Amino acid sequence: MPVKIGIDIGSSTTKIVAFEGEHMLPPMAVKADSQVASLYGAFGRYLYENNLQLLDVEGVYITGVGSKYVEKAVYDRPTYKVDEFVATGTGGYYLTDKKEVIVISMGTGSFFVKVTENEMKHLGGVGLGGGTICGLSSIILNTGDIHEIVPLSRKGDVAKIDLRIGDLAKEKLPGLNLDVTASNFGKADAQSKPEDIAAGIVHMVIENICQAGILASRI
């Protein structure tokens, strides 16, 4: 059965997925120093692990910041470039049964796309994402490896790092519960444990991306 392959060539990671007819095959992510090397490495590995032949591929659809470096057909298969905002919005919309959604792309940085039945609109973005987590962790925790940062963060307690409304008031304020963040890292000090700091970094980035997404939904 003909296969269509989608590849997102990001700044640090290349993501790949395929559809065999209406059936979606398992996605894969590959890291590499070179975006072009990452593309071809991911493509070949994906075919191998899914028992696909090159001639099975009827189309390769590429997007992401690294797609600009691809100037010819991938392995001589029909290759098409797709706008990243369109790809993200369409993919997010596909995964939900809602008629109107805000799709948040959390990558190295993050951006927001509004999608309805009749419209797709890029709403903007923020400079927070995986790059922030890895960068701050490299400076503070001496590791930028996300596979080390995430397990460490799960052992931590963000309540020991963030200042919350409950730390400032005995009763909840109008529209603000006591567990709402008043200040990310507002309680951190030189004695804070690495696992708590890791939890604070991850929480700060994800919380603020989601808050920005909520604000974007009101535009």
Label for each model-derived stretch:
Residues 28-32, 43, 48-84, 117-122:
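Short beta-strand-loop/turn "lid" adjacent to the catalytic site in phosphate-handling enzymes
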Residues 70-104, 109-119:
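Conserved phosphate-binding catalytic cores of ATP/NTP-utilizing and phosphoryl-transfer enzymes
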Residues 2-8, 57-61, 100-105, 125:
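Short glycine-aspartate micro-motif
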Residues 174-219:
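Adenine-nucleotide phosphate-binding core of ATP-dependent small-molecule kinases
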Residues 8-13, 65, 104-109, 127-130:
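A short acidic Gly-Thr/Ser loop motif
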Residues 93, 118-173:
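Glycine-rich phosphate-binding loop plus the immediately following alpha-helix
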Residues 3-41, 45, 120:
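Short glycine-rich, Thr/Ser-proximal phosphate-binding strand/loop in the N-terminal lobe
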